[in-house]
């Protein structure tokens, strides 16, 4: 009969015994052996055919050791076995004041793990501490064997969890797995109190406090705390492929994205891309007769001169277009402008630049009204003073999705219709919606004496006014045609157009201030439009018109129907809706 040797003196004294699959036992479950050590009373008497291994870790009863010493530098107790023992696994701590006990017979010892499996079991400590992957295990339907600590020993030497049936390669993995059933988290952070089931998770957590980032990218200065995060980052440096990493790469700065739409958004703020557009625009402007077809966006450096601060309406346009992902229908972005001197709304040779001309293209009150066409009264808008002919070459294009000023560039002016920003330049030949409204008095014997505009039933307008995508004026003093809106085929109203538009939609309010407006397509046919009488805005889409009318109050048209804010006029109302500063309650 073999008697186990006495435990070292530092292990003597009261303590609780716990197996990996059991709860803490009381002191009644302990009995002292003659040598003074603590032996659980549930252990069988040691015989020639049986032996046991005890692995334990005790903390000093004084309690002066810190958590860091407990989990990072605590001494590990030796493995104690009988002379017949042929296998001893490295000891691991369960928790403070706990003992892990393993029992197996000599018959089991004949089926111990081979050298390869013993090597894997020794590597369990690496798996437990690294803990970046799930514990090794699989479901096995093998029959039960005599009980091992907290599990069932299988014929292949592995352990099976007696709670869920998970098969573990060794006792250490099973021990960590059992904590998912018991809720035990023995590893604690002494700085924030967070607890973990594995030591590797605690070590990784400590890096958050120390700021350590050991994993560094070999291609750039990126660093991170986790290996899997570095693996995900390395995909950005991989070869562009639809199946690997982020295939959509910016050719100007090298950044990669997972989606084409994200790449398009990036190009709107990519400094290198905008700088290349600026250089390309200057090169094209220096070649007379060439058309600007590849210009997708004009940067702010081209929109405004260095000595002139950007106006509020232009800054508003830029801020609104950045929110295109949240809008039902996107704005017409900054696109190509082609303009010729023959299309200018004044006589170049006469030098009469005092004529005020206003061009409003695809205006909206808020991001939700992306398909609306604004018609703001010309008598209230700020006039655009066109300079004499000797200054035409010094003009720079001012392009905005909210307020567009008409200034010359080589070629002729074309504004695209409401379409997605990512479409190619092959669709640019279709002219966008334009509204031309002269400020000067119109001399026409058949015009109305109040505003000088012809009636909508007049059919004597020039055929040149119906040219697709272009609104032009004669060069001399002949009578001017009524204001005309030319709508491209991309407009939402073009698909819904009625060959006989309602007269009420094309006329202004009857009375002394009656106005006439013709909305035609690019081939000259009439297009249905919906006009807000309060804001004097034309909508080509009935849905957007309905949404807009819902913003007006029932009692006062300039009362916000969302928050109840009262505006003095339609400009203040439009500004309030655009800003979206609704204070409800």
From Swiss-Prot:
A motif (CTBP-binding motif PEDLA) lies at residues 425-429. Residues 25-34 have a biased composition (Basic and acidic residues). The keyword ATP-binding does not apply. Keywords: Acetylation, DNA-binding, Isopeptide bond, Metal-binding, Nucleus, Phosphoprotein, Repeat, Repressor, Transcription, Transcription regulation, Ubl conjugation, Zinc, Zinc-finger. The modification Phosphoserine is found at residue 105. Residues 79-98 have a biased composition (Polar residues). The modification N6-acetyllysine is found at residue 335. Residues 475-484 have a biased composition (Pro residues). There is a cross-link at residues 100, 500 (Glycyl lysine isopeptide (Lys-Gly) (interchain with G-Cter in SUMO2)). Its main location: nucleus. Residues 1-43, 68-98, 410-489 are annotated as: Disordered. One of its GO terms (biological process) is regulation of transcription by RNA polymerase II. A zinc finger (C2H2-type) spans 159-181, 187-209, 215-237, 248-271, 530-552, 558-582. DNA-binding protein that binds to the 5'GGGAATRCC-3' Ikaros-binding sequence. Transcriptional repressor. Interacts with SPI1 and MITF to repress transcription of the CTSK and ACP5 promoters via recruitment of corepressors SIN3A and CTBP2. May be involved in the development of central and peripheral nervous systems. Essential for the inhibitory function of regulatory T-cells (Treg). Mediates FOXP3-mediated gene silencing in regulatory T-cells (Treg) via recruitment of corepressor CTBP1. Self-associates. Interacts with other family members; IKZF1, IKZF2, IKZF3 and IKZF5. Interacts with CTBP2. Interacts with SPI1, MITF, FOXP3 and CTBP1. Belongs to the Ikaros C2H2-type zinc-finger protein family. The N-terminal zinc fingers are involved in sequence-specific DNA binding and heterotypic associations with other family members. This is Zinc finger protein Eos.
């Amino acid at each position: 009969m073999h008697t186990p040797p006495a435990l070292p003196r530092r292990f003597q004294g009261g303590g609780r015994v716990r197996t990996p699959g059991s709860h803490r036992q009381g002191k009644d479950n302990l009995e002292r052996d003659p040598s003074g050590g603590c032996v659980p009373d549930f252990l069988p008497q040691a015989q020639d055919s049986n032996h046991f291994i005890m692995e334990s870790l005790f903390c000093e009863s004084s309690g002066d050791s810190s958590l860091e010493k407990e989990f990072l530098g605590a001494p590990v107790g030796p493995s104690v076995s009988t002379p017949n023992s042929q296998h001893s696994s490295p000891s691991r701590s369960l928790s403070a004041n706990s003992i892990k006990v393993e029992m197996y017979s000599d018959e089991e010892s004949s089926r111990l793990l081979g050298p390869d499996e013993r090597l894997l079991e020794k590597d369990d400590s690496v798996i437990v501490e690294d803990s970046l992957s799930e514990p090794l295990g699989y479901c096995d339907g093998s029959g039960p064997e005599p009980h091992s600590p907290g599990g069932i020993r299988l014929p292949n030497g592995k352990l099976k969890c007696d709670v869920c049936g998970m098969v573990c390669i060794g006792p250490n993995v099973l021990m960590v797995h059992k904590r998912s059933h018991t809720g035990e988290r023995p590893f604690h952070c002494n700085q924030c109190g967070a607890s973990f089931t594995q030591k590797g998770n605690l070590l990784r957590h400590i890096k958050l406090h120390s700021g350590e980032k050991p994993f560094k990218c070999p291609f750039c200065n990126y660093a991170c705390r986790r290996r899997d995060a570095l693996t995900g980052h390395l995909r950005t440096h991989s070869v562009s492929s639809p199946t690997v990493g982020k295939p959509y790469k910016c050719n100007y700065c090298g950044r990669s994205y997972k989606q084409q739409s994200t790449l398009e958004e990036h190009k709107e703020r990519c400094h290198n891309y905008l700088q290349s557009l600026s250089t390309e625009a200057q090169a094209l402007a220096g070649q007379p007769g060439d058309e600007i077809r590849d210009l997708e966006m004009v940067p702010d450096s081209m929109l405004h001169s260095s000595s002139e601060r950007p106006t509020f309406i232009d800054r508003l346009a830029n801020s609104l277009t950045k929110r295109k992902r949240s809008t039902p229908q996107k704005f017409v972005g900054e696109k190509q402008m082609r303009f010729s001197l023959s299309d200018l709304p004044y006589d170049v040779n006469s030098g009469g630049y005092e004529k005020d001309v206003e061009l409003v293209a695809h205006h909206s009150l808020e991001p939700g009204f992306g398909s609306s066409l604004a018609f703001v009264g010309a008598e209230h808008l700020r006039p655009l003073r066109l300079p004499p002919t000797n200054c035409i070459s010094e003009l720079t294009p001012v392009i905005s999705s909210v307020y567009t000023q008409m200034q010359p560039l080589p070629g002729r002016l074309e504004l695209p219709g409401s379409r997605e920003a990512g479409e190619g330049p092959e669709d640019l030949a279709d002219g966008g919606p334009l509204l031309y409204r002269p400020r000067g008095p119109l001399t026409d014997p058949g015009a109305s004496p109040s505003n000088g505009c012809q009636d909508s039933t007049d059919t004597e307008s020039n055929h040149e006014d119906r040219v697709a995508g272009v609104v032009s004026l004669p060069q001399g003093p002949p009578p001017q045609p009524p204001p005309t809106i030319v709508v491209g085929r991309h407009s939402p109203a073009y698909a819904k157009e009625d060959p006989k538009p309602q007269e009420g939609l094309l006329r202004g309010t009857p009375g002394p201030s009656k106005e006439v407006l013709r909305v035609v397509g690019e081939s000259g046919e009439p297009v249905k439009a919906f006009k807000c009488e309060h804001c004097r805005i034309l909508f080509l889409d009935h849905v957007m018109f309905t949404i807009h009318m819902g913003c007006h109050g029932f009692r006062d048209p300039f009362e916000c129907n969302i928050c109840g804010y009262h505006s003095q006029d339609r400009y203040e109302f439009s500004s309030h809706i655009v800003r979206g500063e609704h204070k409800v309650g």
